[in-house]
Amino acid sequence: MSPQTETKASVGFKAGVKDYKLTYYTPDYETKDTDILAAFRVTPQPGVPPEEAGAAVAAESSTGTWTTVWTDGLTSLDRYKGRCYHIEPVAGDENQYICYVAYPLDLFEEGSVTNMFTSIVGNVFGFKALRALRLEDLRIPPSYTKTFQGPPHGIQVERDKLNKYGRPLLGCTIKPKLGLSAKNYGRAVYECLRGGLDFTKDDENVNSQPFMRWRDRFLFCAEAIFKSQAETGEIKGHYLNATAGTCEEMMKRAVFARELGVPIVMHDYLTGGFTANTSLAHYCRDNGLLLHIHRAMHAVIDRQKNHGIHFRVLAKALRMSGGDHIHAGTVVGKLEGERDITLGFVDLLRDDFIEKDRSRGIYFTQDWVSLPGVLPVASGGIHVWHMPALTEIFGDDSVLQFGGGTLGHPWGNAPGAVANRVALEACVQARNEGRDLAREGNEIIREASKWSPELAAACEVWKEIKFEFEAMDTL
C-alpha cells in the first residue's frame, strides 16, 4: 500500500457504529436540479426519532452500511451519499412521517430503471429500525430522463398509426381468460373487432399454455384482425402477450408478431421485469410495433398505504422503461382507484410537465422534457352505464377496456361491442355539444339506446351492477 493511500485511509477513521443522522440527515441541504428526489412515508420503530429513521433510509439506499468502514476514506462520501433533507409529520397518522431524500445523479446507471430501483428500494425496506416504509413519489430530473428512450411511440404517433382522433379508444379483454382453444379465441377477437372495438386483448396470464400455444393464438388473432379490418375499413389490433419465461423467448414472440404484420404486442412489466420490458420497448420502436403494458402484480407492491411503492412511482418507471399503454384503474369499476389520486398519476403518464399538487398525491414537479406520453387504460368491472363518467374522467387520450362489459352482452360478442361503441360515440357527441356528462350521463345513454337495440339490451342487463367499496388508496 502506498504511503498516500495509507494516509487517506487512516485519516478520520474510527471503528464502530455511529448514528446515521450525524452523516445523512442534512436539513440545510439545497437540492440540485440534477438530484433524484424521493418522498418516503416512514413509520419508525418505537423509540427511533424521525431524523434517525429518515437518515437511515438515505444511508441504506445510497452509500451507508451498519458500521464505519475504513474504505470510506478512499472516496468522497459527501459527493455520493443520499441526504434526508426534510421531514414532515403525516396529518392524522401518529408516528408517521414523510421523509424527503436527495440522491446524487452519479449513483445511477444511465437508462436503467432496474438500477434505479435496486438502489432506492432494493434493500432498505427490510431495515429493522422501520416498522413500515412506502415510496410515495420520485422526482426524475431531465438530465436523467434524457438517458431513456421511453415509450416506443407515444400518444400522437399511435393516433396517426391508427388514424383515430377525437375520442377515447375502445378495447376488450377476451374472456374466459384461460381455457379457450386458439381458434375459438380468435373467433371472439374477430366478433369484438367487427362490432366496433379498436382493440382486443390477451389477459395478463395468457402466455403459452397447453390448451393454447402462443404461436397458434398469434396466427388466429392475426386472421381476426385482418378480416375485421377488411369488413369495417378501420385499423384494428389485438394485444398479443409476448411475456415469456426468458427474454429470448419474449423477443422471439415479438419478432413473430412483427412478421405477421399486426400493430401491437403486450408485456406484463412487473412480473416480466424492467430489463425485459426496456429491451422489448426498444425493439418495438425499431420495428413499428405499439406496446401495451399490463401491471399484473402491482397491488402486491402498491396497495398497502403504509408499506411498499405507490403506483405513481411504478407509472413513472414504466414511462421511462417504455410502453404505449398501461392499466391505470377506473375510479368507477371493480378495481382500486380514488379519483384525485388516479388523475394525478394519469397526468404523470400523459403530460410533458406536471406541477406539484399534494391534493392529488404529486409530491414533486415533474418535467418529462421530450419523453413521449403513455395512454392510460381504464379496465375492470366497467360497462355501458359507466361510459359517461369514464369519458369525463379520462378524456380522449385514454383506452376504455370492457371485458365482461362486452362479452357478457346477452346477444353475443359483436352486439356487446356495438353497444359500447354507440355509448362512446353518444358521450363524445354530447360532450362536444356542451352537455354535462357527470350530471346528464344516464339520460345521454338512455337517449342513445332508443336508436340502438344492442345498447338498450346492455343497459337492461347491467342497470343494477355497482361496485361500491371505499378506496384504500387515500391521501
Swiss-Prot record:
Propeptide cleavage-removed residue intervals: 1-2
UniProt-listed Enzyme Commission number(s): 4.1.1.39
N-acetylproline sites (modified residues): 3
Modification N6,N6,N6-trimethyllysine, positions: 14
InterPro entries per UniProt: RuBisCO, RuBisCo_large_chain_AS, RuBisCO_lsu_C, RuBisCO_lsu_C_sf, RuBisCO_lsu_fd_N, RuBisCO_lsu_N_sf, RuBisCO_lsuI
PROSITE patterns for the chain: RUBISCO_LARGE
Compartments in which it is found: Plastid, Chloroplast
Active site positions: 175 (proton acceptor), 294 (proton acceptor)
Residues at the site labelled Transition state stabilizer: 334
Top enzyme category: lyase
Taxonomic superkingdom: Eukaryota
Biological-process GO terms, alphabetical: photorespiration; reductive pentose-phosphate cycle
Alphabetical UniProt keywords: Acetylation, Calvin cycle, Carbon dioxide fixation, Chloroplast, Disulfide bond, Lyase, Magnesium, Metal-binding, Methylation, Monooxygenase, Oxidoreductase, Photorespiration, Photosynthesis, Plastid
Catalysed reaction equations from the record: 2 (2R)-3-phosphoglycerate + 2 H(+) = D-ribulose 1,5-bisphosphate + CO2 + H2O; D-ribulose 1,5-bisphosphate + O2 = 2-phosphoglycolate + (2R)-3-phosphoglycerate + 2 H(+)
Binding site for substrate: 123, 173, 177, 295, 327, 379
GO MF annotation, one: monooxygenase activity
Entries under PANTHER family matching the protein: RIBULOSE BISPHOSPHATE CARBOXYLASE, RIBULOSE BISPHOSPHATE CARBOXYLASE LARGE CHAIN
Subunit structure: Heterohexadecamer of 8 large chains and 8 small chains; disulfide-linked. The disulfide link is formed within the large subunit homodimers.
Miscellaneous comment in the UniProt entry for this protein: The basic functional RuBisCO is composed of a large chain homodimer in a 'head-to-tail' conformation. In form I RuBisCO this homodimer is arranged in a barrel-like tetramer with the small subunits forming a tetrameric 'cap' on each end of the 'barrel'.
Family of the protein in this entry: Belongs to the RuBisCO large chain family. Type I subfamily.
The protein, known as: Ribulose bisphosphate carboxylase large chain
Provenance organism: Eucalyptus globulus subsp. globulus (Tasmanian blue gum)
Lineage of source species: Eukaryota, Viridiplantae, Streptophyta, Embryophyta, Tracheophyta
